[in-house]
Curated annotation (Swiss-Prot):
Protein name per Swiss-Prot or TrEMBL: D-aminoacyl-tRNA deacylase
Main location: cytoplasm
GO cellular component: cytoplasm
Keywords linked to the UniProt accession: Cytoplasm, Hydrolase, RNA-binding, tRNA-binding
Keyword 4Fe-4S attached: no
Length: 149
């Protein structure tokens, strides 16, 4: 399971012209599920996201986590983060999970995150979405449950 994590001042997502999720200070996550992912991968990613220290303390050091600052999360399903563009000019998505498995693990991840974080908003799985992000920093971190990076 993989996530592009962006620290934001605010973020929102629109589907079919309607706003379906909005957060203030916190993290926007673009989440992809791999073929071989399990609930353990989702658990790992959930713990990492909730406790990742990428918020600044009073000395401007990254010492505070999402939970420390009472931040919010916008989770966007995005199979393209599983893309492999090392060869050729078109990304290969052969490592991305099939729809049913991806949706099940994505929903599992969101529910686990809701147990830790005060506010979690989501896009719509497999929908075309317009995601607006006001980056804070910018601070962007890549996470992978297989620890590829």
């Amino acid at each position: 399971m993989r996530a592009v994590v962006q620290r934001v001042k605010e973020a929102f997502v629109i589907v079919d012209g309607k706003e379906v999720g909005r957060i203030q200070r916190g993290l926007c996550l673009l989440v992809g599920v791999a073929q071989d992912d399990t609930e353990e991968d989702a658990d790992y990613l959930c713990e990492k996201v909730a406790n990742l220290r990428i918020f600044e303390d009073e000395t401007s050091k990254f010492n505070l986590s999402l939970m420390d600052v009472g931040g919010e999360v916008l989770v966007i399903s995005n199979f393209t983060v599983m893309g492999d563009a090392r060869k050729g000019r078109r990304p290969n998505f052969m490592f991305a999970a099939e729809k049913e498995k991806a949706e099940r693990l994505y929903n599992y991840f969101v529910e686990k995150l809701k147990q830790k974080v005060r506010k979690v908003e989501c896009g719509v799985f497999q929908a075309h979405m317009e995601v607006s992000i006001l980056n804070d920093g910018p601070v962007t971190v890549l996470l992978d449950s297989k620890k590829i990076f």
